[in-house]
Amino acid sequence: MNIAVYPGSFDPITNGHLDIIKRASQVFDKVVVGILVNPDKKGLFSIEEREKLISRVVKDMPNVEVRSFSGLLVDFMKEENIKVIIKGLRAMSDFEYEFQMALMNKKLNPDIETLFMMTCAQYSYLSSSSIKQVAMFGGCIKGLVPDEIIEDICKKSNNK
């Protein structure tokens, strides 16, 4: 079985993330959306909330699973028998950072490959950080995140 992991914090998931997930799910037998647990970072949503939100968004994609992990991505991949990392790229600045990470992951486990997928132009400006900021100030996030989670983001942002 050809399995890939799409790792990230997804706080919150954006339409750019969802676009990569959809496209990757057409290439791989299974895609695992891997939510990184970073205890040093206080997110808008808890890990459990992110798992639920993403699961709701991908519920109609039978070959997509949502899991959280802590520690090194390569260790998670070894446990799950995954050999491919999917990374979305919005701009050259993303590539420089992700290229360094790909080299580090390859050094830690030579069996791992990183595949880069270009974000569709319509989503190239999106980031979870910008979504949180727009929502916090009461701006419209329709079209930026999946419709199923707009209300969750707005409620959570207004409670901050």
Curated annotation (Swiss-Prot):
GO terms for cellular component: cytoplasm. InterPro entries: Cyt_trans-like, PPAT, Rossmann-like_a/b/a_fold. It comes from the Bacteria. ATP binds at S9, F10, H17, G88, L89, R90, E98, Y123, S124, Y125, L126, S127, S128, S129. One of its GO terms (molecular function) is ATP binding. The keyword Magnesium applies. It is an enzyme of class 2 (transferase). Its EC number is 2.7.7.3. CDD domains: PPAT. The record marks H17 as: Transition state stabilizer. Signal peptide: none annotated. Its main location: cytoplasm. It is found in: Cytoplasm. Substrate binds at S9, K41, L73, K87. The keyword ATP-binding applies. Pathway: Cofactor biosynthesis; coenzyme A biosynthesis; CoA from (R)-pantothenate: step 4/5. It catalyses: (R)-4'-phosphopantetheine + ATP + H(+) = 3'-dephospho-CoA + diphosphate. Keywords: ATP-binding, Coenzyme A biosynthesis, Cytoplasm, Magnesium, Nucleotide-binding, Nucleotidyltransferase, Transferase. Homohexamer. Reversibly transfers an adenylyl group from ATP to 4'-phosphopantetheine, yielding dephospho-CoA (dPCoA) and pyrophosphate. PANTHER family: PHOSPHOPANTETHEINE ADENYLYLTRANSFERASE. Belongs to the bacterial CoaD family. This is Phosphopantetheine adenylyltransferase. It comes from Clostridium tetani (strain Massachusetts / E88).
